[in-house]
Amino acid sequence: MILQTVLPIVFEELGPKRVEVEVSQTQLSSDAGLLPIRELDRRLGWTESFAAQLSDNRQWSQHALVEMVRQRVFGILAGYEDQNDHDTLRSDPVFKVVAGRSPDDNNLASQPTLSRFENAVTAGELLRLEAWSLEEFIRSFDQPPHSLTLDIDLFDDPTHGEQQLTFFHGHYDQYQYQVRLVTCAENDAIAFPVLLHGTANARLGVMPDLERIVRRLRAVWPDVVIRWRGDCGFGAPEVYEGSESLDVEYTIGLAMNPVLKQNSEETLQL
């Protein structure tokens, strides 16, 4: 966020040293911590590669796709999740730098421009981004792994209540999306992110996604042993059968019920 000093103040008796507040006409920023992250991104080519998965069908544009991707990515990293924040951040010198511009260059994209940009993303582009995420995960390994343990988890993502496919979830007591992440226990990397509507069942599309992941991993590493773990939300016959057909090991939690309790009491007492 932009900061700008107003009045010069000198404190003579705040300890052993004189403290002086100096007026500056230059716009300052409280988000300089993004600069080393942007340097890491430059070396990895992450945001540039991400933006390359999107199509730009605009006949005329003032803001490049990669700039808008960086605006949103680095904004979220800095805690500015709302598009409205960028009505202020678009003139922040640090955000200009991390987007690829000079600090004294023209302002970045406004909130309406960012909204149009995000709403223009197609289903095909989302599939490309899923594939891109999986390829980035594969590239995170220096050597072919002997085995992989994939954790599949569902997270709530609160919303303002008016976005497309956001619904009120009684358990979380909020309007939300749900995010399903496939992460790797060996290196904590995200292998496959999926955004679901606010009241979606945890199992929605999980087996097609898992099949897609397993087939790609085995195409790259034919001998890798794959196992996955999930909570009781994934416990269903079609998930067990699908995992067996993919020849993967799996550990899935079970919700407590009277039959399970009765059959497990003796074992749990050991």
Language-model regions, residue ranges each:
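Dynamic "connector" segments at or just before major functional cores
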Residues: 1-201, 207-220, 246
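An internal, acidic/charged active-site-proximal segment
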Residues: 195-270
